[in-house]
Curated annotation (Swiss-Prot):
High-level lineage: Bacteria, Pseudomonadati, Pseudomonadota, Gammaproteobacteria, Enterobacterales
Encoding gene, per UniProt annotation: tpiA
Protein name: Triosephosphate isomerase
GO cellular component: cytosol
Keyword Isomerase carried by entry: yes
Subunit structure: Homodimer.
Length: 255
């Protein structure tokens, strides 16, 4: 049985004070929660501080991006080996903001996926369609293309122990969210697409929902059979709201 994972993507938010305060709040709110994996991805500059603040807790450390290179003349980048060295486990790749603002291609993201697997880190592969693609009925085609970039270069076994986050771009930071039924349909398509090559791999892969998940809509989303937690943006910056989402995932998947 799949173990749900709720991960907080802090994006470009944080300060030394906020890291201390938010993690203290999370530790308090989540101290008794069982049955749901939890991870946070602060900005890279705060990873070491977050690692120390998380010590002894069950909250895993994540990161928001990685470079394809392990070392060398790549100013401003962070390698998979560095992330592993500092204690990060879950690494977000392919987020729509990276695809849009940094023109990251499916091919580059597949390379990042491969590097993370090679180093022993867990890729959190973000896929999803824009509003125009959604309205044109291209959701499944877009998701398939983004998955195939990994499947065709690394093979289906690469998804063993990996995480996929379906993030409809039109729902990120907009307050809009897919209905539970809409989200479930896409999550099922993603799992079925992988199952065409290996049903066992498809059955174990965690597929998070990442489109404006908050403390109000989480419980209903998590009742869906193929939604295995969430990649949370804005709500992950508030300990109480994030805790509601984690608790909803733990409760729904225990039922």
């Amino acid at each position: 049985m799949r173990h749900p994972l709720v991960m907080g993507n802090w994006k470009l938010n944080g300060s030394t004070h906020m890291v201390n305060e938010l993690i203290a709040g999370l530790r308090k709110e989540l101290s008794t929660v069982d049955g749901c994996g939890v991870a946070i991805a602060p900005p890279a500059i705060y990873l070491n501080q977050a690692k120390h603040e998380l010590a002894g807790s069950r909250i895993a450390l994540g990161a928001q991006n990685v470079d394809v290179n392990l070392s060398g003349a790549f100013t401003g980048e962070t390698s998979a080996e560095m992330l592993k060295d500092i204690g990060a486990q879950y690494i977000i790749i392919g987020h729509s903001e990276r695809r849009t603002y940094h023109q990251e291609s499916d091919e580059l993201i597949a390379k990042k996926f491969g590097v993370l697997k090679e180093i022993g880190l867990i890729p959190v592969l973000c896929i999803g369609e824009s509003e125009a693609e959604n309205e044109a009925g291209q959701t499944e085609a877009v998701c398939a293309k983004q998955l195939d970039a990994v499947l065709n270069t690394l093979g289906v076994k690469a998804f063993e122990g990996a995480v996929i986050a379906y993030e409809p771009i039109w729902a990120i930071g907009t307050g809009k969210s897919a209905t539970p039924a809409q989200a479930q349909a896409v999550h099922k398509f993603i799992r079925d697409h992988i199952a065409k090559q290996d049903a066992a791999v498809a059955a174990q892969v965690i597929i998070q929902y990442g489109g404006s998940v908050n403390d109000k809509n989480a419980a209903e989303l998590f009742t869906q059979p193929d939604i295995d937690g969430a990649l949370v943006g804005g709500a992950s910056l508030k300990a109480d709201a994030f805790a509601v989402i984690v608790k909803a995932a733990a409760k729904a998947k225990k039922a």
